[in-house]
């Protein structure tokens, strides 16, 4: 099983997503498995790809989990990328890396990669966009830094990408702004006409400090 594999290899594992029957409804979920083989959580896709996923029920909770001594991760699935509030909810809960497993071979992969970069910039975090390659999908997985730069990118074939990330950089970018300028999370928090979500999940945003010009 995936849990046995994660324990054997001493890795945290998210083996993509699959359909899952829960509480009388069919959902699309991605399991998060720790390096001890424990099932940490099941992330439910919020936005089914309608009308193609007709009959699939979307989830109503954002998925954030902490890997001890590493950092805070957010997870959303495939079509969730197309809805900015999905990634914003993850960032507001402190996600420093957002993981995005998908399986698509559609002609809009170019646009998805644009949105992935925009998401990294808007949420000031690392964004790991993983798409199935080979016979199942068109691949082109991409890893993006918290200022929108492409760190590494796969081809259309099945491929393994390895990268080391500095999560302290997320903290610096969120504190000082992208290139020392835009501070969207703090601006979102301090807006006098906030969205409802700003009131619901304000605790993490308050840890970012005052919205001010960074000192040299």
Predicted regions and their residues:
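CN hydrolase (nitrilase-like) catalytic-core segments centered on the catalytic cysteine
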Residues: 1-14, 81-161
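Active-site catalytic loop in hydrolytic enzyme cores
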Residues: 4, 20-96, 106-114, 118, ...
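Eukaryotic scaffold repeat domains enriched in small/polar residues
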Residues: 8, 59, 93, 213-216
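Glycine-rich, aromatic-flanked loop segments that form ligand/cofactor-binding clefts
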Residues: 10, 18-21
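C-terminal beta-strand edge segments of enzyme domains
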Residues: 64, 126, 132-216
């Amino acid at each position: 099983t995936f849990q046995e594999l994660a324990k054997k290899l001493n890795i945290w594992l998210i083996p993509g997503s699959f359909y899952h029957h829960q509480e009388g409804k069919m959902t699309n979920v991605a399991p998060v498995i720790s390096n001890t083989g424990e099932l940490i959580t099941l992330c439910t896709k919020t936005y089914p790809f309608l009308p193609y996923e007709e009959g699939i029920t979307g989830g109503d909770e954002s998925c954030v989990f902490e890997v001890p001594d590493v950092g805070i991760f957010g997870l959303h699935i495939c079509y969730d990328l197309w809805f900015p509030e999905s990634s914003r909810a993850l960032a507001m809960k402190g996600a420093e890396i957002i993981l995005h497993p998908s399986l698509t071979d559609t002609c809009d992969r170019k646009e998805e990669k644009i949105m992935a970069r925009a998401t990294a910039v808007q949420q000031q975090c690392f964004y790991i966009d993983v798409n199935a390659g080979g016979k199942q999908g068109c691949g082109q997985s991409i890893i993006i830094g918290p200022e929108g730069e492409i760190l590494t990118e796969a081809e259309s074939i099945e491929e393994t990408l390895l990268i080391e990330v500095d999560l302290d950089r997320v903290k610096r970018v969120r504190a000082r702004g992208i290139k020392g300028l835009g501070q969207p999370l703090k601006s979102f928090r301090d807006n006098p006409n906030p969205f409802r979500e700003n009131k619901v999940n304000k605790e993490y945003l308050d840890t970012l400090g005052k919205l001010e010009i960074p000192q040299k």
